[in-house]
Amino acid sequence: FIMPIDSLYKWLDFIGESHEVVTNLKEGTEFDSLDKHILCKKYVVNPPKTSGNSSRQAKQPKGISKLVENQFRFHYDTVLIKKCPWVIKPNDIISITSKVHGTSGISADVLCKRPLRWKDKVASWFTDVPDTKYDYLWSSRKVVKNQYYNKEASAGYYGCDIWGEAHSKLSPYLTKGLTLYYEIIGWLPTGQAIQAMNGKAYDYGYERPVWDPTTQTTPYEYGKNFGIQIYRITYTNPDGVVFEFSARQVQQWCKDKGLIPVEQLYYGYAKKLYPELDETEHWNENFIQKLANDKRFHMEELSPTCHNDVPHEGIVIRIENGLSEAYKLKCFRFLGEESKSLDKGE
């Protein structure tokens, strides 16, 4: 929630508070109350009640974990650029890519724990026996699906392992130490949309899988029913040190492998995007304001690739500085429809 400073002063006058409570705040400070007066709070839809003992803790899967410390890493949280517009400087080289509305996935070929047989344990008394090996891991945004040996991958939120489907398409391109971060878009094997809003699917041009009475199956094909867009690539060495591919390297690697990266909308100096802006006069604020309404990036417009009339989600900005960070700018039109959808319990 963003409140103009003039409106904040009027509110302070209304409740009888001095303006001094905010005059010493630094730019970028986040707060939801002033002197115990609540300004705003996040609206959370109450989830439907479920039967059974809600206090019972979910059983943890048993088995041998594959994970080696500092080898597999989840994706970092993308920061709202409106919270920190000053991070982009006019002379920064930036990448702007389209933000699609799907589900996040990760595929990696990293060092994993190697289960030792009794022969290995005996041999370890006399010589060094490796206890790690390179192996595949795949995950959703927060859950590794094949973390344990001899365990089936979890179906997860959608009731089917869409992440395993995506991983099977990407694993042939993985080399030792490589991790791919991507968005899965389109449809699920069940025929449901990966993402929908107010009853309309974010199909991104993919066809809904249909039951075939001849084969008694529902054919599900990569490139026809669902797609994968890669937005980040890292290399992790045996010591756990991570090398981050630049935005340009991600685009080039995908091109070389015949895979699809996120759509790159702009690459170059930030100042050249809007050369009419004065760098000495509130350049950062004006830059973000221009960006938020730029039709070249489909801002505040319908998705350019979906068959359905659904709002474009927004854009992602990366600064080419070698750091593991990215910034997002969502369309107000998308956020408004998302709020309506959440209110309906979708």
Description of each model-found segment:
Residues 1-346:
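Core nucleotide-handling region used for phosphoryl-transfer chemistry
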